[in-house]
Design a protein with these regions (language model features):
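NTP-dependent nucleotidyl-transfer catalytic core
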Residues: 1-134, 139-142, 148-154, 167
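Conserved nucleotide- and phosphate/pyrophosphate-binding catalytic cores
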Residues: 144-240
Length: 240
């Protein structure tokens, strides 16, 4: 069964990966609201009639909010060296550019590793999946679990979604596309895909629709505007 980890605890800190400045600290009310909305979106894409595949939703604030600092340093912190933590791109780039990196953010990688350990112990989670920018954090979790329990676990990452311009698509990036209809109405969501750069249309048809690859190959020489409409229709149907 898929386990959806909601970052009610770690979002209070903010992941520095790929960021040039400290993330804005959200209020408690905003965090609770965001968690609820994110869970509702995941339910749309993970809907199933098979009870064995029904997703499990967990909020890491459940365990991170109860941590004893001294005990955590003794049992978990001792497995992390400053040397290795400084080698991570998210840290190294900030320091090289003489940009601020708070102690709070510096600890994020340890907390994410601890999440994996907790899920392995309580849910028998054997694999963590995330974007490629999370590879280092995932490896930290794999190594922590091996040191703590000897269990063999795995990590799987997917490439970050980028536009032909090289810009990353993400919720904190300018022009992000939101899945929550309260933040982006269905028509605006459709319009986002309709306005896709010509160079990205075929790639996005393969990534964001359930069209068979052979069908996409058969139509890829069609008028580009017709393809954009197909992309917009298919992507919107899957969400709304």
């Amino acid at each position: 069964r898929p386990i959806v980890l909601l970052g009610g605890g770690t979002t209070r800190i903010g992941d520095p990966s790929g960021k040039e400045e400290t993330r804005k600290i959200l209020s408690e009310a905003q965090i609770v609201k965001n968690i609820k909305n994110i869970q509702n979106v995941f339910k749309i894409f993970l809907k199933t009639n098979n009870p064995k595949l029904k997703p499990i939703f967990v909020n890491n604030y459940k365990w991170l909010g109860k941590l004893n600092y001294i005990k955590f340093l003794r049992e978990i912190g001792r497995h992390f060296t400053i040397n290795k933590m400084l080698s991570f791109d998210s840290v190294k780039l900030r320091l090289e550019r003489e940009q601020s990196l708070s102690y709070m953010e510096f600890n994020y990688m340890i907390l994410q590793a601890y999440d994996f350990l907790e899920l392995n112990k309580t849910k028998n989670c054997l694999m963590q999946i995330g974007g490629s920018d999370q590879w280092g954090n995932i490896v930290n979790g794999v190594e922590l679990i091996k040191r703590q329990s000897g269990n063999q676990v795995y990590g799987l990452t997917t490439p970050l979604i980028t536009l032909s311009s090289g810009a990353k698509m993400g919720k904190t990036e300018k022009g992000a596309v939101w899945l929550d209809k309260k933040m982006l109405p269905p028509y605006d969501y459709w319009q986002f895909w309709r306005n896709t750069d010509d160079r990205d249309v075929i790639k996005f048809l393969k990534m964001f629709t359930d069209m068979p690859l052979n069908e996409i190959e058969n139509i890829q020489e069609n008028n580009i505007n017709d393809l954009k409409i197909i992309l917009a229709n298919k992507a919107t149907e899957m969400l709304h």
